[in-house]
Amino acid sequence: MALFGSLDSMPLEELLLVLKSKEGALEIWNVKGLPATTLYLKPGRIRSIDQRGKPLPPEAAKAVLLTLLKAREGSFEFLPNLRPRHRVRLNWPTEKALLSLV
């Protein structure tokens, strides 16, 4: 299931709930103050958050996720079945991550 759109029509928290049973890469760009960001997802989990092709450490990933959750401008595309090329994993439960940051 390929999915694309803008954060003004579907905020990230809604988007993550729609995608909670999917595996793939959620690419987000045109968010003020952030470079293009990729969230790698697997069912029920945020596997990794990457910028410029590199995984972010947990504290930086939390800050970026919080900024993305607040963003109401930006574009996204979900690419199913893509996995990160690196072995760094956050492996955060999606709903727990949303509840702890919102």
Q: Residue ranges of each PLM-predicted region?
A:
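Acidic, Ser/Thr/Pro-enriched low-complexity segments and adjacent helix/loop capping patches
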Residues: M1-V102
